[in-house]
């Protein structure tokens, strides 16, 4: 109230908490009868209770002399229930329905907020309720009548058969032994309705004596509702601060949460979803939807969500396929899980699903039989993969479920390029794991190219020819301009320039450089290897020998970032093939933010030059003639000097492998002892072998040179 004087205190009442009946006091409610019609004056014939379940049954007499009682109907019910012959087990011994049973049900499981109050001599005594039960008439006698009817019918059918029939033939009995019950089966059995019913039935009934409202025993028990020694010191429950007293009197309700309808564990409302962090929202949506365009994701998250933050979050849980986002395999198949169909581990499932996703980056269509042949997975697992992201078309195969999203591709080129780098790394991994033939595969996954079915083959060839002619003309003009500049150099008087023919070897080098393919397909990547139409080394007026890049290039931000990556990588790995280095570099690019300087395009030549400039050397491993290693896998680079005590040991080891493809351990150990002039311990030899080599079939190979 705004003015406390308008709300004066009329009376102060002491409140006491009585606990004598706290574990025994129940409140009975009769919802089918008005409060004015009580059962107090009706004879109670019997009472029983199951304390653990808080289940009560009361038997009350029916006034058969009441003019409203239908005697003929009562006799008929008694006859149906007990039959014509009365015995000790009869429900109605008087052959008349003269009693009815009331069975209880719990109204609430949380009664901590309820109490019975007794006001006496200016004091309010509260006793907590142990349970609140509603009693309704039970019609179990109808079940007994049905059972009697079925028994009579069975007896009649048995009586029709001949009395002179021979004894039944001996029947064979099959004995079965139950298998040991697993923990999951036991939990399912314990949670079943049948088990709960059996558990409830096992609890014995406790028979009670009923005392009427005015009985002396009832009067005696009613005294326990008063707190003993209310003026003494014992009753300290309510000697609390006002806030503590209010909390005790009205504790926070937990019942509302229990009463809410329980939704399935995999269902989450949009209201609940938006209370979660953004990253969790994206993960839950993608895990449930599997495939989604970016525009749809933004509409589900709400208009107030920043698209940049969503882009950052979606790349952690999904991959870009044809402009749409497909949930990552490790989200659907977490570690330590397995296939419900075949039981294969999650790692194998993720690899197979990644192959399906990668196939859809190449084409709109995928054939299930081809996927099963490559991945060696069962048909059910492959079908699950395809159903996540495709729809089946009769006599055609599986088509990607969503149309190509060209709008997203145009709007977010940085994200597209980053995803392309990730797919390049995944492709390299799939080629190695599944031993895919490189000739049958595209050279590189196109950076989320448009749908293949929209442009025919002739049109593609014509477009490619046109672009090649345009680029060739531009490069020719730039080359002529550079030649003109080189023809009139500033030569001091009296200086004669010696002219020598260009060696065929140099021409071949130039041709080889011109044929080298850059690692990316970005427009800026066209100039990473060619400067004004000339190879980098030639355009700058100096060749790149022994890994030293052209003057001026080492100081650029791109060169510095690239060198830092190369040095850090070789400090960890020591020996890498060019193929593995490119894969690690693509993964490094995928972890960088959009717009980073390294996205400008790095060619193979520039990467190799940076490796050699970082203190590494190329090891010319003599691969066997029948090797299946690609040219990039045959280029092996190793850290020559790292500044630690193992440099000399590592250099000796690398010299051994420059003359041998594979070596035995005893040969390595003897050579190390010979070159270093001392006997090396087993730990020192193990360290240098672990840094640079792998063991296979009793032989040691440089890392990356073993062909599976």
From Swiss-Prot:
GO-annotated cellular components: cytosol; nucleoplasm; RNA polymerase III complex
* Name this protein carries in UniProt: DNA-directed RNA polymerase III subunit RPC5
SS bond list = none
Transcription is among the record's keywords: yes
User: What is the annotated quaternary arrangement, including any partners?
Assistant: Component of the RNA polymerase III complex consisting of at least 17 subunits: a ten-subunit horseshoe-shaped catalytic core composed of POLR3A/RPC1, POLR3B/RPC2, POLR1C/RPAC1, POLR1D/RPAC2, POLR3K/RPC10, POLR2E/RPABC1, POLR2F/RPABC2, POLR2H/RPABC3, POLR2K/RPABC4 and POLR2L/RPABC5; the stalk composed of two subunits POLR3H/RPC8 and CRCP/RPC9, forming a structural mobile part that protrudes out of the core and functions primarily in transcription initiation; and additional subunits homologous to general transcription factors of the RNA polymerase II machinery, POLR3D/RPC4-POLR3E/RPC5 heterodimer and POLR3/CRPC3-POLR3F/RPC6-POLR3G/RPC7 heterotrimer.
Top-rank taxon: Eukaryota
Ranges of Acidic residues compositional bias?
A: 502-519
Q: What segment(s) does the record annotate as region Disordered?
A: 146-170, 485-552
Native organism is Homo sapiens
Residue ranges annotated as compositionally biased, kind Basic and acidic residues, are 146-155
Give compartment(s): Nucleus
Alphabetically ordered keywords of this record:
Antiviral defense, DNA-directed RNA polymerase, Immunity, Innate immunity, Isopeptide bond, Nucleus, Phosphoprotein, Transcription, Ubl conjugation
